[in-house]
């Protein structure tokens, strides 16, 4: 399977499982799980050929571990990044490291300096434990700025943190006072 096919399939799965399952007639439960057979069938009706083998390659080979298969391998979900209001992952609050990072583009800094980090259309703000991960994320949007987040101080003031299955840290928002541009 070519790298391009796997990458295109990953983008398609992200779109469908995080944002628009109805685009192919897929139903997700409140935890974001969708039936793989229904996914394959819905994709085919919309001109995209998927197979279990290809889906498993994408799930297992994705370096960011964006997707998970159910124990019986009959269902799939995105592990975070949802904008679909019907999906409400039941995540447990977790003690974050003292400092977390967020990568963004310089063009977003005026808004961040005014409003802090907000989830936009997603359910949570995404943070990482490693600067390199934050840099890789931020570079997708232009000239990168790494933001250091004082997670320890946020938690002390009552903010809640969660960690997705793939290690991404999540929180509802990050107010300006907890952000330092590096």
From Swiss-Prot:
Family designation: Belongs to the KptA/TPT1 family.
High-level lineage: Bacteria, Pseudomonadati, Pseudomonadota, Gammaproteobacteria, Pseudomonadales
Protein's name according to its UniProt entry: Probable RNA 2'-phosphotransferase
TM region positions: none
Pfam families reported for this sequence: PTS_2-RNA
Function, as annotated: Removes the 2'-phosphate from RNA via an intermediate in which the phosphate is ADP-ribosylated by NAD followed by a presumed transesterification to release the RNA and generate ADP-ribose 1''-2''-cyclic phosphate (APPR>P). May function as an ADP-ribosylase.
Source organism per UniProt: Pseudomonas fluorescens (strain ATCC BAA-477 / NRRL B-23932 / Pf-5)
UniProt keyword annotation of NAD present: yes
Keywords per UniProt: NAD, Transferase
Enzyme class: transferase
One record GO biological process: tRNA splicing, via endonucleolytic cleavage and ligation
Top-level taxon of origin: Bacteria
E.C. number: 2.7.1.-
Single GO MF annotation: tRNA 2'-phosphotransferase activity
InterPro entries per the UniProt record, alphabetical: Ptrans_KptA/Tpt1, RNA_2'-PTrans_C, RNA_2'-PTrans_KptA, RNA_2'-PTrans_N
